[in-house]
Each structure stands twice: as C-alpha cells, then as structure tokens.
C-alpha cells in the first residue's frame, strides 16, 4: 500500500505537491495558533518540510521552511498583542532558532536524498553492465548459424523481451545423419530465467551424448537433474526432436511445451502435443516419445508462448489461430523467411505495445 502511494505521489505535477506541502504547513499553523502557549508544534512542522524536500526538491523545502517562519512571525505578532508582557526579544530569538533548525533539516535531508540517488544510480549502472555482459554471453550460447542438415532447411531466432532471455533453442549434431532440435521456455523473466536457461542448455549438451534410448529417456534425465538443481516453482517447458536423415523420421518428446505445428503438403496441420509435464516440476517422470515422417514440403514450426500470447494495445492475444493462418499462407517459403514473417506479424499486431515475453521460433522445412 505505502509503495503504491509513494509511486502515486511521484507521478503528480510539482505544483500539486508544493500546494499539498504549503497547505499542510498552513493547517499546522492554524492548530498551533489555537493551541495553548505551552504546547510546541515545532516537531510537527518537520513533516511537511520533509515532504517538500523529498518529493519536490531542496528549493521547495526551503520555501516550506520560509512559509513556516512567516507563520511563526504572524503568530508571534498576534501573541504580542494578546499578551503585552511577552518579551519580543525572546520571541525573535526563538524564531531564529526554529528557522535555523528547519533550514539545517532541509539541507541534511537534501544531501541524504542526493547520496541515496547517487547510490541507486551506481547500482543501476552496475546492474545494466551485468545484464549487458549476460546478454553477450547468452548470445554466444545460441546457434551462430543455421545447421546444414540433408533434407531439412532449419532456422531459429530468439527476441528477448528484457535484455536476456529465458527462452532457449539449439541445433545439436548427433551421430552422422542425425540432428537434435531443442526449444525451451523457462518460467519467469530476466536474469533468474536466463541462468536457469543456461543450466538447461549445459545439462542437455552433457546428457545428449549419454542418453542412447531416445528423446523420452533424455527428457526424463533432464527433468531429474533440473528438479534437483532448482526450487519447486522453477521449471521449464521443453520440446526435443531428433531428425534422422535416412528414413526422414522425426522422433520427439514434448515436456509441457506449446504444441508445435506441422503443416503437411496436403494442407493438414498436425499438433505435436505434450507427452509429459514441464521439466523440473516433479521429481520423476516417464515421458512418452512419438515418431513421424517428414515428406518434402512439410513445415514444422516450434514456438514459445511469447509468440501466441503477444498482446496488442487492447490486450487481445495474437493466438494460435493467426500463427496457423500465416503458416498455411506461407508454407512454401524458406525457413528463414517464414521465421521473419511470423516475427514481423507479431510486432505489427502489437502495434507499439511493449513486448512482454521472449519470442523464440524454430522453423524446419523438409526438402
């Protein structure tokens, strides 16, 4: 509640904040005037002055202190008329002390605010530097060029929403004639998701040479390893497929990931749906794998939810229907051209709305 109220105040125009501070001072002066002489309101005047310094600036704080002094002079003059025995010299001395106290208070608070802002600025610079380094490192983790696969034209891309991505894609050469295609989406955003993504990639690359029993066995091993390394609320959806050039077969496993679309030359669109929960969600899972054959002209599109859940300014989602429509209308294009067309369509749909999630695509076109 308090952070929201502070954020609300920071959004207000300066003149409104100054008016609030000065009205606050006036209200205290009125209470001070009607209160008995033995009651001191000095500590209460600190609050509106602090408000002005913190939300507007030192000049506004000094203005508030000057207005306080003006009210004190006015009150002392009225008190002198009401109490002729009151010594004005003592009153003037008290006024000077109070004014000096408020002026010193304004200066101390202003310096404290400057120090905090400098520290926050330095911390922001350090964070941006770390994010830049992480982004450069992550860029090297993604494939630098499209794989050369006989009978398959492949292209992948990732457009992070916030500097570093929690999405992942990769092309891994296996034994001769076989290639692995991976797409993952780590829950969350920013650096924590990027770190888990790097862990997923490292685990995949180390396990892919050990799992000889197919994609389902690899997914089970990945799930066990990821669950042991992360908290229960950290998980990743994952799609892993192995393309065998000789029989032109695609053997795949889907761990809670968005169902990829497979456009056949006949015009039919098949969905390669989930065959188990996301990686890391539960400790031991027996995943199921499936195999299909790719004929020349078939197009496989693997995507993350940053594509289908992109929203426009009216908060309407791009949706899988639009993606399927683009796939049907442009299935004859190369893998790279189709990737670019999908991303361009998503950005045009958003129409200036901020990108809220990473956009990752892999297109594989049989030839």
Residues of each region from the PLM?
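Membrane-helix interface segments
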Residues: 13-15, 58-63, 214
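Hydrophobic transmembrane alpha-helices
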Residues: 20-36, 49-90
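Membrane-embedded alpha-helical segments of multi-pass membrane proteins
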Residues: 40-48, 78, 92-103
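Transmembrane alpha-helical core residues of multi-pass small-molecule transporters
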Residues: 67-71, 93, 97, 201
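… and, occasionally, acidic/histidine-rich disordered N-termini of signaling adaptors
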Residues: 118-301, 338, 344, 348-367
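Cytochrome P450 core scaffold surrounding the K-helix E-X-X-R motif
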Residues: 262-265, 311-317
């Amino acid at each position: 509640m308090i952070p929201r109220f502070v954020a609300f105040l920071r959004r207000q125009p300066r003149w409104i904040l100054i008016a609030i501070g000065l009205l606050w001072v006036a209200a205290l002066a009125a209470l001070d005037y009607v209160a008995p002489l033995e009651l001191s309101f000095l500590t209460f005047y600190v609050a509106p002055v602090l408000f002005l310094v913190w939300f507007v600036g030192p000049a506004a704080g000094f203005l508030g202190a000057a207005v306080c002094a003006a009210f004190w002079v006015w009150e002392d003059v009225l008190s002198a008329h009401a109490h002729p025995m009151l010594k004005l010299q003592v009153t003037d001395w008290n006024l000077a002390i109070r004014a000096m106290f408020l002026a010193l208070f304004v200066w101390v608070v202003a310096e404290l605010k400057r120090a905090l802002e400098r520290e926050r600025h330095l911390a922001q610079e350090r964070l941006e530097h770390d994010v830049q380094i992480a982004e450069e490192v992550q860029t090297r983790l993604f494939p630098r060029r499209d794989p050369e696969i006989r009978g398959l034209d492949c292209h992948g891309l990732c457009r992070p929403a916030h500097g570093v991505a929690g999405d992942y894609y990769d092309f891994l050469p296996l034994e001769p004639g076989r290639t692995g295609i991976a797409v993952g989406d780590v829950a969350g955003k920013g650096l924590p998701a990027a770190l888990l993504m790097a862990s997923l990639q490292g685990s995949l690359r180390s396990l892919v040479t050990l799992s000889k029993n197919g994609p389902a066995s690899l997914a089970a091993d990945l799930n066990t390893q990821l669950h042991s390394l992360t908290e229960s609320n950290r998980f990743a959806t994952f799609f892993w497929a192995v393309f065998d050039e000789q029989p032109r077969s695609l053997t795949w496993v889907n761990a809670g990931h968005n169902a990829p679309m497979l456009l056949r030359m006949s015009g039919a669109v098949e969905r390669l749906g989930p065959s188990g929960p996301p990686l890391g969600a539960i400790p031991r899972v027996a995943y199921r794998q499936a195999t299909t054959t790719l004929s020349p002209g078939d197009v496989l599109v693997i995507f993350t939810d940053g594509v289908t859940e992109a929203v426009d300014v009216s908060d309407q989602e791009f949706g899988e229907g639009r993606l399927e429509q683009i796939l049907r209308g442009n299935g004859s294009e190369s893998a790279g051209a189709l990737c670019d067309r999908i991303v361009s369509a998503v950005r045009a749909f958003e129409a200036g709305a901020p990108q809220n999630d990473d956009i990752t695509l892999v297109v594989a076109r049989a030839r």
